[in-house]
Every structure is written in structure tokens, then in C-alpha cells.
Amino acid sequence: MKTLIARHKAGEHIGICSVCSAHPLVIEAALAFDRNSTRKVLIEATSNQVNQFGGYTGMTPADFREFVFAIADKVGFARERIILGGDHLGPNCWQQENADAAMEKSVELVKAYVRAGFSKIHLDASMSCADDSIPLAPETVAERAAVLCLAAESVATDCQREQLNYVIGTEVPVPGGEASAIQSVHITQVEDAANTLRTHQKAFIARGLAEALTRVIAIVVQPGVEFDHSNIIHYQAQEAQALAQWIEKTKMVYEAHSTDYQTQTAYRELVRDHFAILKVGPALTFALREAIFALAQIEQELIAPENRSRCLAVIEDVMLDEPQYWKKYYRTGFNDSLLDIRYSLSDRIRYYWPHSRIKNSVETMMVNLEGVDIPLGMISQYLPKQFERIQSGELSAIPHQLIMDKIYDVLRAYRYGCAE
């Protein structure tokens, strides 16, 4: 990461896409996509997804590292080319607890990530806890971030410190996605970004962390990109020029969250304007969902009724029976809920792929389709871009490859934006 940031600050057009997903097919796609390049791949876990108690994936940071490395070994991607990051490390998961208890858990969270070899650490203590004011004072946020940084430094080996990098600050939306429709977004003001940096510098120095400050490579801001269930707010470069000019006076770059669904031109403009770390998550699993839905439609036409996976029906049944991951985000009417469950850009389905019933139905569908020849006309109907690549000899009509290539479509846009 340090080399990439140095190259960007030296004037090169270079950025990096941060893959924020724990889905094995998404991670496989991210690694396979860059297998034959010289680029490193940045894969990040969030604090609610992976933590010392297992998170919603059931994985600790060490478990997640081994999970990613096993996929890398399978696809032939060198482990040393993987950068592991921890996103929103702080009280995010424990906001319902008092601040002291939440921060104790947050300290252990950061230690677990660093011990597991994660080298990009987002110190985010911006969330109010049960006994806090809303919003927190910037000074309190910075003081807590310094406590978390101290925790990281206390367990990092000398070798780890050479690679260790910190990201500070936070964007406006809550981690995990918008809960309601958006019409506009508040772009971070220069004075707020400057205040974030100033308060963190002061808090770090007060705790004897002056050297650790040199490891702060990025600040999270809102450049004016966001999405909800059916709306996308696109990057307007002219609106972010004050931010772009301010960061040039520092040794840092920006990290932009929720960059999913922007155009490839927007990614290039974002990197040009020093938003050099572009985070993506739901767009990748949305592409995965599109591929699985397309294959499910193909299965319905090619496979005898008694042998079908009923994949789409199973997904719907499970999500209606167990609505905890989407209920507070999606619309309330039954038909509206079904549309959001299937097609929302927020892609809450991503929380359900590990469910045993859904996992088994997808596996059945894949086995069914691997045993038949899929007519080209059907691929053209349901996966038109993949049809074109099959026609040009770049791709085979194999279900797994079709899913991979569908995810590659998202990664291709980021590569266009980030490539030197």
C-alpha cells in the first residue's frame, strides 16, 4: 500500500480497488482477475462481518485470513500479493453498550486484526454508544481512534510495522448501507476533513503515537457518491475539487466508500482527484446474484421439473422466513419487499448466501447445468455480455466461468479507473 500511495503522490494515475466481501466466489473472482497481472489485490473485512467473536460470517480475523489464503492457493494467486484490510474497526458492533465496554471490545478487535496479519486498519470510532451524545464530538472520535491505534501498535511486530497502515475518518452513511431512499448526499467540506486530520494528530501525539501518525495513509471522506435500493448518486467531479486540492498539501490520499455502481469514467475521475482507494462490496455480490438468477432461469428451461434446484424459490422462502438482514432496510408492502429482496442495489441477499438451504440449492443448480450443454441463444438471452465473449473465444459456456466473468465486469470498470 505504501508504494502505491507514494506513486500516486508522485503524480502517477494509480489507485486500488478495495474488495469488501466475504463471499468465496467474489474473492475467487478478485484474485483470478488479477492473477496474470503484477497488481496487488486488497481484500477487506468489516467489523460486523469478521471479529473476535466471529461476526455474522462466523469468522475471526485469523479465520478470514486462512479463508482468503485457501482461495488464493486454489486459483494460483501468490499470498504475498494480497493486502488484508479491516474496515470500520471500532465500536460499530457494540453501539448498544456503554462506551467503556464497547471500547474494551474494540481494542481487542483491533488487536485480533493486527495479530492476524491485516496491514490496512481503518480506525473508526465515530459511532455513538449507549451513553454517548449524538453525534460524538470530533475530539472524542479522535481520542478513541488513538486508543485503537495504541492497541494496534502494542501487538504489531517490527516486521508488521513496516507494512502497517492506518485509515482515519468516516463517511456519512452507516456501515452496511443506506436504510432509506436518498436523493442527494452531503460532500465532505474541506474544513471538516482538515479538522478530522488535526484532531487525530493531536490525539495521537498526546498518546505518544507520533511515529504511528506516519503510517496514516488515507482519510475517509464523502466525495458525493452513494446508492440506495434503486437510486445511484453519481460522482460530480466539479463538486469535489476543493477536497482534491486540499489533500495535495498532505502526504495522504482519500478513501471513498460506497463507490459501487459508478461508471468507469467516474472511477478514473475519482482516482485523478486523489480518491485513490475505492471500496466496493454490494456491486460485486449484485453481479453474483445476477449471474445466479440468470442461471436459475436457464435451469428452469433445461432441467426436468423433478430435478430442478428451485433456487429462486428457496432464496425467497428463506429471506421471508428470516427477515432480520433486510427488514429494516426494505419497503414494507409485500410486493415491494419482494422486489427489493430480489433486485435492490443494496443487495441484502449477500447476507443469505451462506444459509444451508440456499447454498445447497445453488450447488444443485450448478451440478444440473454442468451436466448439459447450454444453448448459445439462452446465454445471449440471459447473459448477453458473456455471450459476446464466448463468441470471441475469451470464455467458455461453463456455469462457474459465467459467474466469474459476470463479477469480472464490475472489476473491469475499477481496473479502468485505477490503472496507471
Curated annotation (Swiss-Prot):
Family (UniProt): Belongs to the GatZ/KbaZ family. GatZ subfamily.
BP term (GO), one: galactitol metabolic process
Top-level taxon of the source organism: Bacteria
NCBIfam families linked: agaZ_gatZ, PRK15052.1
Gene Ontology CC, one term: plasma membrane
Protein name, per record: D-tagatose-1,6-bisphosphate aldolase subunit GatZ
Pfam families: GatZ_KbaZ-like
Subunit architecture: Forms a complex with GatY.
Species of the source: Escherichia coli O6:K15:H31 (strain 536 / UPEC)
Gene this protein is translated from: gatZ
